[in-house]
């Protein structure tokens, strides 16, 4: 009698045979290893924060075994609701255990013992490190003065409450001062410009988008630059759902903030946002779409009426835009089109949308001000 064996029955038989082997005495050593691995190990969760040169300082819940972080959890407390969202860390925070557990991480003071660039260091005690730093600091202050000490702020943990730049600043001020700096590589120009334009650097919250009909973003890309616990991208989307606002993204690159969520993307030549803003103002002025009572009440130097008495004639903003100022150049859409590479008809359309939307949410990112004359772009 000849039995026929199908491919399926052969696979079933092989699987059963493998299962029998897996449960036989051959696996006893491995079974012991499994039981040993399952032995109770003390585990705890501690709260920390993410300090990676970012101001969000997101909450992190670190799960620790054998004094080693093996899992990082973000904020899971409370109810994640609009207006009171959870502070969820981005990928930098969620992967921070790789930074903490990295073999090249400096855990102790290291003193150079060779020439610069040789990479020769030896471990020293904290007491020796503090004595070395304080002795050299006293020597430099005595021999060269306080201006010989410059404190940098890009430390990698500058965003922390305890680890931020104010701590060494306070220390050096207590010693008589130090060589400081103006601004920062992040926001130097926009910080200076906004203080002159608005008196402060504070703006309104993204949740104000819920009250608008139009959102215009000049070089603002929160999906890639504000993806941390501030939750700006998520906030923007939630607010837009409430207002159904039209969103226009102005950026040289089709960025992640747009990514199909935008209603219109206007690619612009880098660093020319200021010219676009001037052309928008030209349309608003010439088509009588400005809020004149608001300008008269809150603005200085918009036109001749609010120009300071000692200012030259036609030195006001309106004259500059219309070409009646010292440069004699009218900031028309055609003028801006040659600079920005945005067609004049698109500029006119954008200006009319801004002028007719009541209210509109207009914001700018930090990218446009990181160019020469960036403070003028911000203004």
Predicted regions and their residues:
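N-terminal export/assembly segments and adjacent metallocofactor-ligating motifs
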Residues: 1-289
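Short, hydrophobic/aliphatic alpha-helical segments
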Residues: 37-41, 74-79, 324-329, 355, ...
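Glycine-centered helix-coil hinge/cap
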Residues: 144-145, 176, 197-201, 313-325, ...
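Short coil/turn segments at secondary-structure boundaries
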Residues: 144-154, 183-186, 292-298, 349-351, ...
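Conserved short loop/turn motifs at secondary-structure junctions
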Residues: 152-160, 335-339, 365-372
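A generic alpha-helix surface/boundary motif
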Residues: 165-166, 330-331, 379
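Long, well-ordered, tryptophan-enriched scaffold segments
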Residues: 242, 253-357
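Acidic catalytic cores of enzymes that act on phosphate-bearing nucleotides/polynucleotides
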Residues: 355-379
